[in-house]
Amino acid sequence: MTQRPDDRVDRVRRVFDDWAERGRDEGMAQSHTPFVRPAFESLDLRPDAWYLDIGCGNGYTVRWAAEAAPEGKAVGLDVSERMIERAREMSAGLENVEFHRAAFPVHPLPHDAFDAILSMEVFYYLPDMDAALAEVARLLKPGGRFACMVDFYGENEASHSWPEDVGVEMTLLDSAGWRRVLEEAGLEVIDQRRVLLAAEEASEPWKATEGSLLTLGQMPA
């Protein structure tokens, strides 16, 4: 499968617009939460931290950050306008949050502004991952952290059919590859691990045997 970059982005947008319109955003957030929560906690947010979720879906981690950092700012980006609409609806009344429809690495945000960035199941969709990771590095403050989580990766063979299943081209890297691309973007990888569910809690076997791959990078201070 080979898609032009613009076609790839548009296909991803349409997939997630459709999921939001059918209410799948809440199920996705619920299924991701056991994996994402440890990644979120690894960011060690201070009360005044600026936080960004790239590919925020309905904004569930942005709301976590708004609570954890009440004196800071919590921002979500997503390529799907429908997801952003859901995020704004579900975050109504929170004063320290904002959401933007953006096809990362294009975005309206300031550089050297964020203490922490998280992304769950996003970067392998991006046509130019190197450019996107370089932009993450520009967005982070010195010492800022980036938690990158993926379920589609080399060691998780159960995921390898997903590009054909979804109809979207994806970039497949193994754990060493994810470490390499973060380091090439200028981040120091300070942790890499797989987050697993207990077998009795896993809706699919791979969630207990392979799990989500977390690669945690940090900008030099």
Predicted regions: what they are:
Residues D130-P142:
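A short glycine-rich, Lys/Arg-flanked "PGG" loop and its adjoining helix->strand segment in the class I
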Residues M1-D44, Y60-W64, M83-R86, M90, ...:
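Conserved class I S-adenosyl-L-methionine
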Residues D151-E169:
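Short, glycine-/aromatic-enriched active-site segment of Class I SAM-dependent methyltransferases
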Residues P105-A116:
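A short acidic, Gly/Pro-enriched loop at the edge of an enzyme's catalytic core
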Residues G143-V150:
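Conserved beta-strand signature within the Rossmann-like core of class I S-adenosyl-L-methionine
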Residues W50-I54, N58-V106:
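Class I SAM-dependent methyltransferase SAM/SAH-binding core
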Residues M170-A185:
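Short alpha-helix
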Residues A116-D128:
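A short SAM/SAH-binding and catalytic strip from SAM-dependent methyltransferases
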